[in-house]
Each structure stands twice: as structure tokens, then as C-alpha cells.
From Swiss-Prot:
This is Uncharacterized protein Cgl0250/cg0304. It is found in: Cell membrane. The keyword GTP-binding does not apply. Its main location: membrane. The chain crosses the membrane at residues 4-24, 44-64, 68-88, 106-126, 138-158, 166-186, 196-216, 230-250, 258-278. GO terms for cellular component: plasma membrane. Keywords: Cell membrane, Membrane, Transmembrane, Transmembrane helix. PANTHER family: CONSERVED INTEGRAL MEMBRANE ALANINE VALINE AND LEUCINE RICH PROTEIN-RELATED. It comes from Corynebacterium glutamicum (strain ATCC 13032 / DSM 20300 / JCM 1318 / BCRC 11384 / CCUG 27702 / LMG 3730 / NBRC 12168 / NCIMB 10025 / NRRL B-2784 / 534). It is a multi-pass membrane protein. The lineage of its organism: Bacteria, Bacillati, Actinomycetota, Actinomycetes, Mycobacteriales.
Amino acid sequence: MQSNLLAVLFALASALTIAWGTVVRHRIALRTPKDGSLRSSPLLNALMTPMWWAGMSTAMLAYFLQTVALGFGTLLVVQPVLVLSLMFTLPLSARFNGYRLRRTEIFWATLLTVAVGIMIVLGRPLPGNPHPPLDRWIPVLLVGVAVMGGMWLLAEYVLKKDKALILGLVTGALFGYVAVMSKAAVDLFVHQGITGLILNWEGYGLILTALLGTIVQQYSFNAGELQKSLPAMTIAEPIVAFSLGYLVLGEKFQVVDWEWIAMGIALLVMIVSTIALSRTSTMPAGSKR
């Protein structure tokens, strides 16, 4: 059953739960020692922390709500709504870490959210192919592996100062792939039942990509302040998901003439807002405890 209203409501609930889980896992990352020992591994340190598992449980609930939303609406409807998690995460992070958001941060975060909202309201997305052929998937998967692998190497060995930002982009891109695979898996389940999920590769690819995204996300949290990595994740995920929704699933925006200009401006505002947020840091050093 297609219902954009239900899709938006479930996506909004997902955004709310994403925010809390993100803040919890980032606080754990800030407590991780950076002495090069095995104990300093962001992933191992997180796995040994009960609150991380609480945060992950919240993240799983958020993902379940996102999946339900995808059952009611297209990827191009659900994905932009999830960017609202940024509006909830930044104030929560400020509250838990004992600092105050600047007006400029609030301005850019609001502008980012408004821009994404314009894209969904003006775009009026149409559904695509519920089960695209494999030859549509292979090129985008190969390109994704090459680009994200290259970005990881840059963050590790070349652009260490911007490691949190770059890993945030990689995380967002991975979850963009997760979003598309989620939509494909949901459509498989709706049309073919559990047998369709078992006999097709999309469900297994979804699990693998989601696991990889969670690991990279924890490393991005450990690499720096939340204001560095979170905006990058927030902007990369819908852009990658939009692109794959067009290329793989065949979903389309109902946009004509001047509306394309408005959509382009909204996309530009999204990018500028993300850069502005990623370059702003209000968390005092003393809060990293």
C-alpha cells in the first residue's frame, strides 16, 4: 500500500530514534584512548561498553521504522525526512557534552533541513522497479567500492586532519547503499514473501553493507567531534540514495521546467550547509572526557 503520509510519519519517528543512538555512540568514542593499543580500537572499546549496545538497540529500532516507512513510500520520499535527525542530534550532543550551540550552527542546520524538505515536497517522487535486474546493480557497486575505498585511504594516510569529515562521508555513502538495498529487500518481501528474500542476494547484501556502515561510523565518531562527521553523513546518505534510486530502482521526481532550478538550488544549499557545519566546532576540549 502506497501512502506518503504514513511513510513520512514512520521516517520522522526513525529520525528521532537515530538522534539518541548517534549521541550515545559518539560519547563512547570520545572516551576511547588513542595510544595505539588494542584497547584503543574504537570498535572493540564500543563492544565492551553496555551503553553502546543500548545505543545500537535504538539504532536498530530506527532502522526498523525506516524499513516500515519504505514499505509505504518511495526511497525519494523517506530518505529526505531522515535528515531531520541532524536537527535532533546536535542539540542532544550539546546537552550531554555540556556546551551550547551557536546561532550559526542552528541557522545552518535549519537551512539544511529546509532544503531537503523542499526537495521532497517539490519533487513529488514516483515509485520505480521493485526488483531491478542484476546488471543495474553491478556498475554502481563496483564504483562504490572503488570510491569509498579510496576515501578511506585518504583519511588514513593523507588527509588526517579531515579524517572525521571524510569517514563521515564514507559512512553516509554506505548508508545510502543500505537505504537502496532496504527498499529492494522490502519490495521483494511484499511481492514474493520470505522466499523471495532467501532466494535473492539483496537481503544478504543489505546485512553486509549495514554491518560495514556501522563499523565505519564508529571509526568516524572516534576520529573527531560530532559536528565534523555527522553533517557529512547526513548529506552523503540522501545524495547517494537519490542517485541510486534513479539509476537502479528507476524512481523519478515529477519535476518540470523552473522546478529543476529550484531543486538544484535546494541541493546547493544542502551542500553549502553541510560544509559550514563541518567547519564549525563548538565542543570545548574539556568536554572530551
